[in-house]
Design a protein with these regions (language model features):
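N-terminal pre-domain/capping segments
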Residues: 1-180, 200-201, 206-210, 257, ...
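Short helix-terminating capping/connector loops at secondary-structure junctions
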Residues: 14-18, 227-228, 315
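Conserved Rossmann-like nucleotide-binding pocket used by diverse enzymes
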Residues: 22-24, 234, 321
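Acidic/histidine-rich catalytic cores of soluble enzymes
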Residues: 35, 81, 199, 203-205, ...
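Short, small-residue-enriched loops and turns at beta-alpha junctions
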Residues: 89-91, 148-151, 188-190, 239-242, ...
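A short helix->loop->beta-strand "cap" motif at the edges of active sites that frequently abuts
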Residues: 138, 231, 314-318
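Active-site-proximal loop/short-helix segments
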Residues: 184-203, 242
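Short acidic/histidine-rich active-site segments
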Residues: 319-325
C-alpha cells in the first residue's frame, strides 16, 4: 500500500506531461508557404500537388514560421516548447534573407534558396520570431537543421564551409533561445562497407574511419563554438554515418564535450531491430531533445509507448518533440496522436 501511494504521489499531472513535449514544424511542412523550387530538398512541388497537402491547406490554412508559435498554442494544449525545421525559416517573399546554393545528392544537382541567418534582414526576421514566441507564450527548444553539410566530407574546404554554416545557425539558435541544434554528420548517404581484401581476408573498413575522424574533428569545433553561445550541437540517427548508433556513440565519445549530445529519433533506422536496440544505445547520450516519431514504414513493429519507456528507463529527462513522418493521418492529426501516446507513457 505504501509503495502504491508513493507511486501515485510521484505520478505526473497532465500539465506536467505536456511540459515534457515540444511541437514540431516538420509534420506540417506541407502547409508552410514556400518558394516553388525545382528539385527542392523535400519534394515541394510534388507535395503541394498531393491530395493530402491540398486537404491540409484547406483544413488548417497556410502558415509561415512566424505563425507557428500561435499554432502550437491553438493545437497542442499545454505545450510550450517547439522543434523548428531549418528549411522553413525566413520570409519566402524576401530574397534578401536567402542565399542560392547548388546541392548534390545521389548523382543529381539542384539549386535551392536557403535561409542565411547571418544576413541583416534575416536577423531582423529572427527578432520577429522571438517576439511572436513571447506573444504566444512558447519557446524555441530545438532546431532540426539541414543547412550545414559536408561535416565529414573528404574535401577539407567543403568541410570548413559546412562548419561555417553551422556556426551561423548556432548564433541564430542563441538569438531565438533554442537549447539544441541538430547537425547532420554528412558523408555518403549509404556508408562504405568493409571489404575482405586485407590481410588474411578478414573484413576491414578503412574508408569509414576517415569519415568518422572528420566528423569528430568537425563536431569538436562546433561544440566549442556552441559552448560559447550556449547552444548544444546534437547528432540524430538520420542517414549516412548516423544511421548506425555505434557510429554516433563513437563520435560523441571522441568529441567528449558537454555541448555535444544525441537527439535520438524513434524511427530513423535502417532495419526494425534498431527500433529499440538502437534507441537504447543512444539513450545515455541524450539529455535535451528526442524525436518521438511515428512512421508507418515499420508497421506493427513500432510501439510509441515502448520507445518512450526505453528513454525513461535510461534516465532521460528532456523533451519529446512530436515528429510525425507518415501514416494514416495528416500531419496535425499525426502529431496529436503522438501527443496522446507519449503522454500516456509518461
Amino acid at each position: 500500500m505504501a509503495a502504491s501511494a508513493a507511486t501515485d504521489a510521484s505520478a505526473l499531472t497532465e500539465a506536467q506531461k505536456a511540459e515534457r513535449l515540444a511541437s514540431n514544424t516538420y509534420p506540417i511542412r506541407w502547409i508552410f508557404k514556400r518558394r516553388a523550387t525545382a528539385g527542392g530538398g523535400m519534394g515541394a512541388g510534388q507535395a503541394r500537388t498531393s491530395d493530402m497537402a491540398e486537404q491540409m491547406r484547406k483544413k488548417y490554412g497556410e502558415l509561415t514560421m512566424l505563425d507557428f508559435p500561435q499554432f502550437t498554442r491553438d493545437h497542442f494544449p499545454g505545450v510550450r516548447d517547439m522543434d523548428l525545421w531549418s528549411s522553413l525559416f525566413g520570409d519566402v517573399t524576401d530574397d534578401s534573407m536567402f542565399t542560392q546554393s547548388t546541392v548534390s545528392r545521389e548523382g543529381r544537382s539542384f539549386t535551392s534558396f536557403e535561409f542565411d541567418p547571418s544576413l541583416p534582414t534575416a536577423r531582423k526576421w529572427l527578432d520577429q520570431l522571438v517576439a511572436r514566441q513571447a506573444k504566444a507564450g512558447v519557446r524555441a527548444h530545438h532546431v532540426s537543421n539541414n543547412a550545414p553539410r559536408n561535416i565529414s566530407d573528404l574535401d577539407v574546404d567543403a568541410r570548413k564551409q559546412g562548419i561555417a554554416v553551422a556556426k551561423k545557425w548556432l548564433d541564430a539558435c542563441a538569438q531565438i533561445g533554442a537549447k539544441t541544434m541538430r547537425v547532420n554528420t554528412g558523408g555518403p548517404r549509404i556508408v562504405p562497407s568493409a571489404s575482405t581484401g586485407g590481410q588474411g581476408g578478414y573484413p576491414r573498413n578503412d574508408e569509414i574511419v576517415t569519415y568518422l575522424r572528420n566528423a569528430v574533428e568537425s563536431f569538436k569545433e562546433m561544440a566549442d563554438y556552441g559552448g560559447k553561445v550556449g547552444v548544444k550541437v546534437t547528432i540524430e540517427n538520420h542517414w549516412g554515418l548516423s544511421a548506425d548508433p555505434t557510429n554516433i556513440r563513437i563520435i560523441l565519445d571522441e568529441v567528449s564535450h558537454p555541448f555535444c549530445e544525441a537527439t535520438p529519433d524513434f524511427c530513423n533506422w535502417e532495419h526494425e531491430y534498431l527500433l529499440y536496440h538502437g534507441l537504447k544505445a543512444l539513450t545515455p547520450y541524450a539529455r535535451t531533445t528526442v524525436h518521438a516519431k511515428y512512421w508507418d514504414r515499420w508497421g506493427p513493429q513500432q510501439d510509441v509507448k515502448r520507445s518512450v519507456k526505453v528513454m525513461l528507463d535510461g534516465g532521460y529527462k528532456g523533451k519529446f518533440a512530436l515528429e510525425y513522418e507518415a501514416g494514416p493521418w495528416d500531419g496535425v492529426e499525426g502529431a496529436k496522436y503522438l501527443m496522446k501516446e507519449v503522454m500516456a507513457a509518461l
